[in-house]
Amino acid sequence: MADVNKVVLAYSGGLDTSVILKWLQDTYNCEVVTFTADLGQGEEVEPARAKAQAMGVKEIYIDDLREEFVRDFVFPMFRANTVYEGEYLLGTSIARPLIAKRLIEIANETGADAISHGATGKGNDQVRFELGAYALKPGVKVIAPWREWDLLSREKLMDYAEKHNIPIERHGKKKSPYSMDANLLHISYEGGVLEDTWTEHEEDMWRWTKSPEDAPNVATYLELTYRNGDIVALDGVEMTPATVLATLNRIGGENGIGRLDIVENRYVGMKSRGCYETPGGTIMLRAHRAIESITLDREVAHLKDELMAKYASLIYTGYWWSPERLMLQQMIDASQVHVNGVVRLKLYKGNVIVTGRKSDDSLFDANIATFEDDAGAYDQADAAGFIKLNALRMRIAANKGRKLF
């Protein structure tokens, strides 16, 4: 193996990364620094400290990144109304750039010459982590054990852990459960019965949301206040970004909002089925489009929609730190200067229904849009010339004998 003196490992404390920790120590004979990120995954992160200490790790980083995650990554993404392939709200994808950033920061702080992660060679995360790392520290060495070792099943990982006395909690028999990933934006489920695209997901799989059938029979109303495209208050109460998302997750989950079962196209070429719970994000997307509907110029709104697919693809495929994503972000953020106001929503049994929107920056003019007497605010006779000019090219083509069918 190449000389490695110190490596920073993205460490969850679970089976995979605990095995990786021991494997790095034995294979590279190097010092390992562990980094555990609290992104609001809903699990205690402190046990990772005890596990790392038990395995001889001397430098242990456990960072609360919830506010930075939502403020600097989730909110900017939602300003673009970002959706991948029409459905996926990119809950896993958007967390990876922050983890990569912090891995590199810790490597610089500790003098480490390598970083390591637990992403497999089949998935998107290996690309996301490593593109981010190379963008931020071009000369860094990246160690991806799943692309090097022969521990290619959960059973082999468990056997390795037992052989090397790695502290791992065992639940029941040796059986592959769902592969899950969680943060403050979502929780994902892959593998197991989901690998058969015809098999319905099991109800007890879901952890954050009630089934819409079991959600309350009474609707919940919410008012979201926007400033420059970001939510700053719920029902008039100002909140930090992370608190906004956590609160929307709770309320949305209670109302059966945010479940998704999709087959997506991975960057590496394969199709993959995943189930997702994104209650807060689902609410945020609907509300943001509602406030933009009255505050954005038509052509700006349409251009944003055209650019969104590219922006979503950049995030999904790991190009958050690329110059093209940064360029698009500047355009998106410039469009949000007038995206201010309040959106009222009704949440009911899995549905997010917009019931009102208002803004001092609204471009909606009731005097012009009214079906009643507009007192001359809009001259309907002007429409005749507008229509004729827009039809001119088609009229010319028809006069030249061009056939349409």
From Swiss-Prot:
PROSITE patterns: ARGININOSUCCIN_SYN_1, ARGININOSUCCIN_SYN_2. One of its GO terms (molecular function) is argininosuccinate synthase activity. Its EC number is 6.3.4.5. Gene3D superfamilies: Argininosuccinate synthetase, chain A, domain 2, HUPs, Single helix bin. Its main location: cytoplasm. L-aspartate binds at T120, N124, D125. One of its GO terms (biological process) is argininosuccinate metabolic process. GO terms for cellular component: cytoplasm. SUPFAM superfamilies: Adenine nucleotide alpha hydrolases-like (SSF52402), Argininosuccinate synthetase, C-terminal domain (SSF69864). Keywords: Amino-acid biosynthesis, Arginine biosynthesis, ATP-binding, Cytoplasm, Ligase, Nucleotide-binding. It is found in: Cytoplasm. ATP binds at A10, Y11, S12, G13, G14, L15, D16, T17, S18, A37, G118. L-citrulline binds at Y88, S93, N124, R128, S179, S188, E264, Y276. It catalyses: L-citrulline + L-aspartate + ATP = 2-(N(omega)-L-arginino)succinate + AMP + diphosphate + H(+). Pathway: Amino-acid biosynthesis; L-arginine biosynthesis; L-arginine from L-ornithine and carbamoyl phosphate: step 2/3. Belongs to the argininosuccinate synthase family. Type 1 subfamily. Homotetramer. This is Argininosuccinate synthase. It comes from Pseudomonas syringae pv. syringae (strain B728a). The gene is argG.
